[in-house]
A protein has these predicted regions:
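N-terminal helicase ATP-binding lobe
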Residues: 1-657
Length: 657
């Protein structure tokens, strides 16, 4: 029997085409969180209006649930905000001559009284208690930022930049009924200090100001990604025209949730090779009340199972009133069919039986998932599915999907089968977080670190420019370091056309995406004779992202043991080679094995001193325990020479019960 460690390790990418287990069936019924539902609801609304922008951060008026009127807005300002603003203005006047204007000027026709119903609501909310909500109400968040902006204006330039950038972007959020008096005060400060902003300094610390900015990240607007807007627009156009859509967007930018939005106007067949992806989509869809069917490991259409929401005919338990048995042969109500690649043809004919083919979209997730193998059991299944497909609308979705010119045979085959078919390519490089690549030595990998010749650099830049989704894997900190160095040393560039002022005119331009694109521009226009100097300089300036763990093999220190021993899973020996040193020629893997130790084990004083061994440098090998603190702000890719051994060790050391 597999232990939890072995199960987790061996099932990270399960491509087995089999039926769902009882546990997997039960898992889809677990509702997702409210925040996730808000995002899903926005995606569904976005299908009908792709310009939708929502923000759940409450303003004072929306929190108090009071109608928005000019007199009420003025009253809110005077009761809750004016005293805070006046204190800040008084402090600012000691150092700056800012011209503040009274935000509310009474007119003759302005109403001067508040409705009794609104008075009752105001009386129910004590002023002191409202002001305690400074971390959640929009106006108080802005005033907190203005206070810190004034505080650090002369004391700490780095913090001042941080709060200016944060205030600038927070003031532009789409909040329901923000107080205009507070916004006017904020804009007056931003305008006054505008000339103090140094774009180069903003870029230099962009990893703090953008990627690690909890204010901007927590209170950000909810809106569709650009690639989702294009997908929805294309699918709504010319509904009778066949379409092949090549959908290329970075991982974790909502591609897998897009079918839920598409189901607002179409019937969806979602095809996935990895079962956990389909199970996850089923969970999200059911949480939003979508009517789904599941087809995993199906030999015939009789193996397809409907969720209760999609059931049309069924029998009930006469005692409990709950559904007892569903007639799975009737799929009139199915909105989303979720299937593995083995069951696609069964699902396709099943859906075509109840719905017009022109209104069905086959949404194929990761169609190239096994194509890096010379041969694979899935290859024949994929070929048969493509050959026998009768659905005229297909979306091929993957972050690494080949470009249209690289798969012309596929495109022409689709056009030959569906006359007049439109071919669309959606390419996006939207991302909110970077996924840095860290090598076994603990350093971040970037193009300017790995391209040791100008020819390699040119080839790398051509590839990155053609596949901008790769920008996701550029570490923002290292990107900014390189950019700032070339800004300060323009002699390495071919000409002055690439000066920072031509690319960044204001703070709206200082985004993660633009900084990384500017990085590509600079790298692409470095002088050929200057590249060896630049390459050597940055090799010497490399910084550890994960610092070495200097340990002596065979010695127990505070932390984890590196000595050779047996690695056991629930009492069963799992032999494998020690990951910290090479196996001598002629030796067996059993001679050098791992042992799991308690994560904070101390050396006993009575233990005899062991013979000192050479110090081993193990950068980040404890990513699942004591090195985990280095993996901040999202996922990280860790490159290992032997993935299996490192993976087993990390899972073992995690000590998951």
């Amino acid at each position: 029997m597999k232990t939890p460690y072995e199960y987790m390790y061996n099932n990270t990418m399960d491509l087995t085409q089999r039926k769902l287990t009882r546990e997997e069936w039960n898992s889809v019924e677990i509702s997702v969180s409210k925040d996730e539902k808000d995002i899903l609801q926005m995606i569904m609304k976005g299908y009908h209006d792709n310009s939708i922008i929502e923000n759940k951060t409450p303003s004072l008026l929306s929190y108090l649930k009071i109608a928005h009127t000019p007199v009420m807005e003025q009253h809110i300002y005077q009761v809750y905000c004016k005293d805070i603003i006046e204190k800040q203005k008084k402090k600012a006047s000691e150092s700056y001559s800012i011209n503040f204007i009274d935000p509310f000027t009474q007119t003759k026709n302005a109403p001067k009284t508040i409705k009794k119903a609104d008075i009752v609501r105001l009386e129910q909310n004590d002023v002191s208690k409202i002001k305690e909500l400074s971390d959640s109400l929009f106006e108080f968040i802005l005033l907190s930022l203005t206070g810190k902006l004034l505080k650090y204006a002369t004391a700490d330039r780095h913090r001042w930049n941080y709060y200016y950038y944060t205030l600038y972007h927070c003031s532009k959020l789409h909040i329901l009924h923000p107080n205009k008096g507070v916004l006017q005060y904020v804009n007056e400060l931003l305008t006054y200090f505008e000339d103090h902003v140094d774009i180069t300094s903003m870029i230099a610390r962009s990893h703090d100001y953008i990627e690690k900015n909890q204010y901007v990240y927590k209170h950000a607007d909810m809106k569709l990604y650009v690639h989702q807007k294009r997908l929805f627009s294309i699918c709504k156009q010319s509904p009778q025209t066949p379409k092949l859509i090549l959908y290329i967007a970075p991982t974790a930018t909502g591609k897998t949730l897009s079918p839920i939005g598409l189901s607002e106007g179409h019937k969806i067949i979602f095809v996935c090779a990895a079962r956990h992806v389909g199970v996850s989509l089923a969970k999200y869809a059911i949480s939003m009340g979508k009517r789904i069917a599941l087809a995993f490991g199906c030999e015939t259409a009789d193996d397809i199972r409907l969720h209760y929401f999609a059931a049309k005919e069924y029998t009930k338990d006469w005692r409990s009133g709950q559904i007892r048995k569903v007639d799975n042969s009737i799929g009139d109500k199915v909105e989303i069919m979720i299937t593995d690649i083995r069951s696609y043809l069964c699902s396709m004919y099943y859906m075509a039986q109840f719905h017009p083919k022109e209104n069905i979209i086959t949404y194929w997730d990761e169609p190239t998932i096994t194509m890096d193998y010379e041969s694979h059991p899935c290859h024949e299944i994929i070929h048969r599915n493509w050959r026998e497909n009768i659905i005229p609308n297909m979306v091929l979705s993957s972050a690494t999907l080949p470009k249209m010119e690289e798969i012309q045979d596929v495109v022409q085959d689709f056009r030959g089968k569906f006359m007049g078919a439109e071919i669309h390519t959606i390419t996006s490089h939207d991302c909110k977080k970077s996924i840095p690549i860290i090598n076994p030595d603990g350093f971040v990998e970037m193009p300017h670190f790995v391209c040791n010749t100008y020819d390699k650099l040119t080839s790398c830049m051509n590839h990155c420019t053609s596949y901008l989704t790769i920008l996701r894997y550029f570490d923002l900190y290292e990107t900014a370091r390189f950019v700032v160095y070339l800004i300060e040393n323009p002699k390495y560039l071919r000409d002055e056309r690439y000066h920072v002022s031509f690319y960044f005119t204001n703070l709206n331009d200082v985004t993660m995406e633009k900084i990384k694109q500017y990085y590509l521009q600079l790298l692409s226009h470095v002088k050929e004779e200057s590249w060896p100097v630049l390459y050597q300089y940055f090799q010497q300036q490399r910084e550890y992202r994960i610092h070495p763990n200097m340990k002596t093999q065979g010695t127990l220190t505070k932390g984890l043991s590196l000595d050779t021993s047996l690695s056991t899973f629930n009492g069963n020996t799992a032999p494998h080679v020690n990951i910290f040193q090479s196996v001598p020629m002629g030796s067996s893997p059993k001679d050098t094995q791992l042992r799991k130790m308690k994560s904070m084990q101390q050396l006993g004083t009575s233990r005899p001193q062991e013979k000192a061994n050479p110090i081993l440098k193990n950068n980040g090998i404890y990513v699942s325990t004591k090195d985990a603190y280095t993996l901040t702000d999202g996922p990280t890719i860790y490159i290992a020479n032997d993935v299996e051994k490192i993976g087993r060790f990390c899972i073992q050391q995690a000590a998951i019960p």
